[in-house]
């Protein structure tokens, strides 16, 4: 099975050298790789294949999500092929980004993980700069690069220090290891390491790059940003908690408070957004704040809840960005003040908006509800005083979801809207691919909650 996976990963490079039908090749091979990923998930709880590749439930769950989202990105970006907007270059970029992300999730080596973690920045910037919408995309790329690099360089220094002190860079070796470092040094190392991941997440106060990047990115860029790239930060935090578990317990109250206050603040910011993509981007900050608060509780229940939230948010936020792109093609605007009457113009699209808006606000039977219940209980177990912030977060999340839905679908129809809505089979397939795992995983939740 491992050999089959390696062969298929190598075959994914074919679109780089084949001139004909690059979309079909990448789509087919990505679909073939997905069942391989699930078969490996059902193997041992932790398996180390080589010095540079290992797996457990979290890494393979996120790898499967990466492949699934990549397939949907290709389906959502067929306009690039039809308009001949450098389709081969686009496919090459997507395949490179896919390989980087899978290597990042499967790497047990701390230094290699950092290299793949940073390498994901390059294809993302190429996506925004080459296929972005507005001239401001250069500013968005600059924000993304400066925030990520500025936070990651101190983290690299800490990782090198860990390697020198422990004489190993293998993350599984950190589980029961005692480091000969005093408390202030460990505290500084934890803060610098956490900073690099919190910017990628991003957490409130270091989130300004995210709305800019989402607004200027093409549909494929928004999907991969929301569904996968933000999860690199959460994945890194969960991995490093095995090394800094004592420091995490001593700082969890402060950091969780900041994360929950940020979740409430970004939910309030969502209520006054007029740009649809910006609203969805800010909602991601709120959900990731709740996720990091649960992860920092350092309990098995919190770890499982954080992973469940990453999977649930990856599917729902990707779907919201796909539908935002469909709305833009119908109305030629992203403004919630101008985007009115879609219930009359596109009732099928309205149905999909209702389903995924409900999923985003954690309504049953979505896995978002499961993840939020698990996160709230894990946080309240450690600190009952957090129930006020958790209640406000849940309330304002529902409020901005209803505001987003009613602003677009009710009211008089815009005169500038496309009179013949084009809801194609491709769009129906895309939305179904988002909805099916969101609903079905609730019947087998151990797929996303059995890691600890």
Curated annotation (Swiss-Prot):
Q: Identify a single GO molecular function assigned to this protein.
A: ubiquinone binding
The Enzyme Commission number assigned here is 7.1.1.2
> Per its UniProt record, what InterPro entries does this chain match?
NADH4_N, NADH_UbQ_OxRdtase, ND/Mrp_TM
**Positions of transmembrane segments:** 7-27, 57-77, 95-115, 116-136, 145-165, 186-206, 218-238, 251-271, 278-298, 303-323, 336-356, 360-380, 386-406, 428-448
Keyword field contains Phosphoprotein? no
One annotated GO biological process? electron transport coupled proton transport
Top enzyme class, one word, equals translocase
Q: Which GO terms describe its cellular component?
A: mitochondrial membrane
Q: Any idea which UniProt keywords this protein has?
A: Electron transport, Membrane, Mitochondrion, NAD, Respiratory chain, Translocase, Transmembrane, Transmembrane helix, Transport, Ubiquinone
Grouped into one coarse class, the protein's main location is mitochondrion
**Catalytic activity as recorded in UniProt:** a ubiquinone + NADH + 5 H(+)(in) = a ubiquinol + NAD(+) + 4 H(+)(out)
Q: Pfam families per the record? A: Oxidored_q5_N, Proton_antipo_M
Q: Is tRNA-binding among the key words of this record?
A: no
The entry's function note states:
Core subunit of the mitochondrial membrane respiratory chain NADH dehydrogenase (Complex I) that is believed to belong to the minimal assembly required for catalysis. Complex I functions in the transfer of electrons from NADH to the respiratory chain. The immediate electron acceptor for the enzyme is believed to be ubiquinone.
Q: What protein family is recorded?
A: Belongs to the complex I subunit 4 family.
Instruction: Specify the protein name.
Output: NADH-ubiquinone oxidoreductase chain 4
Please state the gene responsible for encoding this protein.
ND4
């Amino acid at each position: 099975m491992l050999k089959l996976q390696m062969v298929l990963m190598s075959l994914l490079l074919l679109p780089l050298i084949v001139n004909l039908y690059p979309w079909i090749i990448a789509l087919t091979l990505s679909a073939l790789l997905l069942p391989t990923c699930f078969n490996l998930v059902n193997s041992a709880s932790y398996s180390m294949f080589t010095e540079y590749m290992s797996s457990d439930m979290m890494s393979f769950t996120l790898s499967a999500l990466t492949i699934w989202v990549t397939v949907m990105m290709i389906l959502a970006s067929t306009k690039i092929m039809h308009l001949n907007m450098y389709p081969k270059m686009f496919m090459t970029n997507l395949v490179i980004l896919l390989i980087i992300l899978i290597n990042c999730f499967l790497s047990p080596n701390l230094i290699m993980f950092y290299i793949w973690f940073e390498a994901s920045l390059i294809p993302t910037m190429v996506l925004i700069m080459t296929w972005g919408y507005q001239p401001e995309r250069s500013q968005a790329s600059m924000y993304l690069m400066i925030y990520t690099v500025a936070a990651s360089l101190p983290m690299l220094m800490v990782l090198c220090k860990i390697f020198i002190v422990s004489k190993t860079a293998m993350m599984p070796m950190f589980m029961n290891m005692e480091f000969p470092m005093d408390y202030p040094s460990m505290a500084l190392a934890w803060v610098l390491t956490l900073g690099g991941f919190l910017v990628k997440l991003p957490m409130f106060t270091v989130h300004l790059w995210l709305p800019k990047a989402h607004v200027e990115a093409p549909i494929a860029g928004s999907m991969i940003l929301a569904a996968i790239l933000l999860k690199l930060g959460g994945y890194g935090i969960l991995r490093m908690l095995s090394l800094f578990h004592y420091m995490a317990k001593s700082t969890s109250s402060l950091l969780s408070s900041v994360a929950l206050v940020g979740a409430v603040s970004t939910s309030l910011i969502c209520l006054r957004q007029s740009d649809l993509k910006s609203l969805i981007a800010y909602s991601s900050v709120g959900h990731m704040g709740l996720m990091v608060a649960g992860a920092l509780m350092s309990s098995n229940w919190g770890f499982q809840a954080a992973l469940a939230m990453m999977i649930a948010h990856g599917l729902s936020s990707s779907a919201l960005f796909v539908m935002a792109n469909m709305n833009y093609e119908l109305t030629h605007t992203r403004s919630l003040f101008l985007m009115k009457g879609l219930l009359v113009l596109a009732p099928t699209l309205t149905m999909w908006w209702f389903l995924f808006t409900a999923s985003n606000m954690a309504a049953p039977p979505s896995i978002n509800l499961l993840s939020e219940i698990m996160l709230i209980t894990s946080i309240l177990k450690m600190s009952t005083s957090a129930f006020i912030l958790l209640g406000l977060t849940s309330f304002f999340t529902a409020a901005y979801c209803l505001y987003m839905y009613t602003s677009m679908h009710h009211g008089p129809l815009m005169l500038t809207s496309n009179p013949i809505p084009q809801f194609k089979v491709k769009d129906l397939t895309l939305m179904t691919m988002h909805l099916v795992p969101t609903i079905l995983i609730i019947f087998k939740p151990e797929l996303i909650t059995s890691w600890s």
